[in-house]
């Protein structure tokens, strides 16, 4: 089943798309500050592994024009909390174990939101992004197991992951991608382990 969803904000609508295989092993939010051409392919691969996938905008089309919008961690965190509220009210999603796969600039906000909703979010994976920008309080409060995937040439993200890891109290691992390696191999293995655990 496929559905479109929308959340109203003062700055415009946020649109999303739900891919829901039957039966679904769990629900994964694909969290990115703006849609990218690769999103559909990522969602398709995750659904092939049996996961429902919710791809949701975190910024309205109006907000996306502001240069610093993708760095506004408090606003992005609030948007993620609104999405988590939507899931709690939705009959198709509310009973599925929930994970979040964050990409790039969405990562710090995902950590903050998951730390605040520790009974709802069961597992996390991130690919890139400055995870340490989530802040010390959120990093220490996080309980969901976290996989940090980093490209081998992305020294900035790797350094951010190392800084963050020193404060994490949850189960966590870092996976350094080799050149040409598909990050979804590590991500789906991580979700499978922790959804079934």
Regions flagged by a language model, labelled:
Residues 7-96:
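Serine-hydrolase catalytic machinery in alpha/beta-hydrolase-like enzymes
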Residues 119-131:
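A conserved short beta-strand
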Residues 165-181:
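Catalytic histidine neighborhood in serine/cysteine hydrolases
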Residues 142-143, 148-150:
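Short beta-strand/loop motif that positions the catalytic acidic residue
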Residues 108-113, 135:
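Hydrolases whose catalytic domains are alpha/beta-hydrolase-1, hotdog thioesterase
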Residues 92-106:
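Alpha/beta-hydrolase fold nucleophile elbow
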Residues 152-157:
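Acidic catalytic loop of the alpha/beta-hydrolase fold
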Residues 180-197:
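Catalytic active-site module of serine/aspartate enzymes centered on a nucleophile-bearing elbow/loop
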